[in-house]
């Protein structure tokens, strides 16, 4: 474990717990809000679960024993992060698409990827197509064998070498597949969630730290990703995503949310002025229409809710690990 990781662990241990809620002003959350956001994530996406097997000597007293961390297991990664070109790499490769493919960087330095989910979907489809092609070859061989047997053309069978060639094709495809267990814990020093990755190869053998780094965007390897012992288990090496920027990013999102809320209020005020000019019958019709959309308006006026924190957290953390397909949260909000 590096010096940076040791200092980070020490800081986590020494930082006092703050139970006050200041999510709206700072983008940070309290332990109670972390549990609330975790409950919402588990409710919306059952692939995430609260971990209840944390050793007692590693448990944090300010969290419930059965809600020490969140975990989702066996999440696939079909390609390494280097296969996902950044905006810098794409420039010049196809000049006509440079403007469309550029990635926006927010004022805190985090990347807002426009195309990242499309790339992941395309890659996943590509892997599926490759698998289908191989299955088609197997079906083709089986069908030919049956036809030859029924037609009594002969007992010709594929040589062992030919089967070996097919095994090599399958092995090559499977060797690219990795699976990750993802853990979300509460960081006392930064008062935000913290993500840990534990990876395995296609045979279920644990990945070395440097191998896990291959699934992390090169822009973040030296900035936000570090090798640490998993804090909720013994003798488990992981790669953590440093949470130093998380609250800052959330503050930016909160700012945008407030701006949207202000625009919504101005729109409602304008609508009220228009209603005052309507006739009685027109007002009745308009009131019925407003009642139908009332729930949606109330939701928008609330802006970003604290129980949505982990949903948003997973969205902007996806730019760090572009190939790991754990962001199932696109339609949650």
UniProtKB/Swiss-Prot annotation:
Main location: cytoplasm
Stretch list, region Handle region: 248-308
GO MF, one example: Atg8-family conjugating enzyme activity
Compositionally biased tracts (Acidic residues): 95-108
Compositionally biased residues, Basic and acidic residues: 278-290
Subcellular location: Cytoplasm
GO biological process, one term: autophagosome assembly
Active-site residues from the entry: 244
Region (Disordered): 81-112, 278-300
Protein family per UniProt: Belongs to the ATG3 family.
Name of this protein: Autophagy-related protein 3
Species in which this protein is naturally found: Candida albicans (strain SC5314 / ATCC MYA-2876) (Yeast)
